[in-house]
Every structure is written in structure tokens, then in C-alpha cells.
From Swiss-Prot:
GO BP terms in the entry: proteolysis
Enzyme class: hydrolase
E.C. numbers: 3.4.24.-
Cellular localisation: Cell inner membrane
Species per Swiss-Prot/TrEMBL record: Salinibacter ruber (strain DSM 13855 / M31)
Record-given protein name: Protease HtpX homolog
Length: 276
């Protein structure tokens, strides 16, 4: 399913670029836009992991440097029947985490310094298991391509505004510039929300402790309000909790890249109740 979803996102980006290129520059513009879109898809597939890690200053740590974290990841990845991912630490105080990589053999689990300080071992196990569930389901490439598509839509809207030409085209381009970021966020949220619920459920199964993950989500959501992290909007959906704010309400929920944390916690608590 995720392979189909990723392919569809790549195809959407190519078609979007080609259509805008055709509108702005005829056949030549369409060909140029097509080549740019193919190039962006290639970069997204092969290099997105290193780009995202560099963006957040994540550094790979060895077992000698972080033995407890490595042991925890190793124990849980064996339980999930996965290859050992690289382990990275992000130098940020906000407790958060994400997984990246184009497939399980090239996966990375990145956690912030803050998560090591705030969460206890059971909570951290829940978070790591959640990220391993993303790896097992091959969610990382889908989320990365979604981030690329979101950035591409925004870039196209700005490009169209400056090269729109006539008044009618200018008005259309201006409208596109206003609506395109909303469309990009809706694409991200539609993909991210279903991914997060599934990773919560499967992560709780891997860790064998739904309440540990529920407690972690509650602590991270609370900390996000008081420990801001410089994050990029196009990659915010990759994190286990929204890095920009604690609670969301009203219209913000529609465009949020994450499901409501209280709903995620409620589902995990219900899951724990059924297991008793």
C-alpha cells in the first residue's frame, strides 16, 4: 500500500510540474518542468534521509557513546524482525523523534537530546517502537516524498506568481499562492494521520506496553509548549509529535500534520484495557 502511495505522490508531482510548465512556457516549459520534477523525485529517494538529518544537526552515535539507547533499539528491532537502524541524536531540548531512510536496510532512528532527559525507559521504549513500526511499514519514504511534494507545491505557487504574465494569469497565480500551501498541508496531514495511528498501535505491540507510549505522548505534547524547536513545516509530519505546539484546536486541527494527541492516547489506553 505504501509503495503505491509513494508512487502516486511522485506521479502527482511530475504531473503538477508539467502542467504548470505548460501553462507558463508552452512545450519547452513543460519539458523543463518534467525534468525538474524527475530530478526532485530522484533526490527525494536517494538523499532525503541525509538532507533531513543534516537539517536538524543529527549526529550518529555509536554503541560506546550511547549504550543504553543502542541496547533499547537493538532489543526492540529484534522483536520487530528488522535490521539494526542507525541511531542519531538531535541536539534539541524538546523531546521528540523521527525515523527516516528509503527502506528498512537504510533506516535511521533519530531522537532529540531532550527525549533522553524527559522520558523514562518504558516511555522511551514506546517511542522507539513507534518509529520502528514506521520503518517496518516503509512509511519513511512516503512521508519524505510527501514533504518534497508539499515543498514543490509551495515553490510552484511562488514561481507562477512571478511568471504569470497577464492580469488574468496574475490573479490565478495569486490565488494559487494562497491556496497551494493549504493543499500541501492537507496532503501531508491526510497521509500522516493514518500513519501515526497505525504506528502507535503497532509500536505498542512491539514494546508490549501501550500505556508506556501513551505516557510518552502526554509528556512530549506538554513539553512541546514550553520547549520550542526550530523545525521546518515541510518536515514536521515526520516527528512523533508536532514540534511546533502543544495543543491544537479549531481550524488548526484541520491542517495539523498529526492526529490529536488526546485521541492517540485514548486509543492506546483502550488498547491496554482490551489486553487486560
Amino acid at each position: 500500500m505504501n509503495t503505491f502511495r509513494t508512487t502516486a505522490l511522485m506521479a502527482v508531482m511530475i504531473v503538477l510540474f508539467a502542467l504548470i510548465g505548460q501553462a507558463l512556457g508552452g512545450t519547452g516549459g513543460m519539458l523543463l518542468a518534467f525534468l525538474i520534477a524527475v530530478g526532485m523525485n530522484g533526490v527525494s529517494y536517494w538523499y532525503s534521509s541525509s538532507i533531513v538529518l543534516r537539517m536538524y544537526g543529527a549526529e550518529e552515535v555509536s554503541r560506546a557513546e550511547a549504550p543504553e539507547l543502542h541496547d533499547l533499539v537493538d532489543r526492540l528491532r529484534r522483536r520487530a524482525d528488522l535490521p539494526m537502524p542507525k541511531v542519531c541524536i538531535i541536539p534539541q531540548d524538546q523531546p521528540n523523534a523521527f525515523a527516516t531512510g528509503r527502506n528498512p536496510d537504510n533506516a535511521v532512528v533519530a531522537v532529540t537530546k531532550g527525549i533522553m532527559d524527559v522520558l523514562d525507559r518504558d516511555e522511551l521504549a514506546g517511542v522507539i517502537a513507534h518509529e520502528l513500526a514506521h520503518i517496518k511499514n516503509r512509511d519513511m519514504l512516503t512521508s519524505t516524498v510527501a514533504a518534497t511534494l508539499a515543498g514543490a507545491i509551495t515553490m510552484l505557487s511562488r514561481f507562477a506568481l512571478f511568471f504569470g504574465g497577464r492580469d488574468n494569469n496574475f490573479l490565478v497565480s495569486l490565488l494559487m499562492m494562497i491556496l497551494a500551501p493549504m493543499a500541501a498541508m492537507l496532503i501531508q496531514s491526510a497521509i500522516s494521520r493514518s500513519r501515526e495511528y497505525a504506528a502507535d498501535r503497532e509500536g505498542a505491540e512491539i514494546a508490549k506496553n501501550p500505556l508506556g507510549l501513551a505516557s510518552a505522548l502526554r509528556s512530549m505534547e506538554r513539553a512541546a509548549e514550553h520547549r520550542p524547536m526550530p523545525a521546518n513545516q515541510t518536515t514536521s509530519h515526520m516527528f512523533i509529535v508536532n514540534p511546533f505546539s502543544g495543543g491544537l484546536s479549531g481550524i488548526k486541527r484541520l491542517f495539523s500534520t498529526h492526529p490529536p494527541t488526546e485521541e492517540r492516547i485514548a486509543r492506546l489506553e483502550e488498547m491496554a484495557g482490551r489486553a487486560q
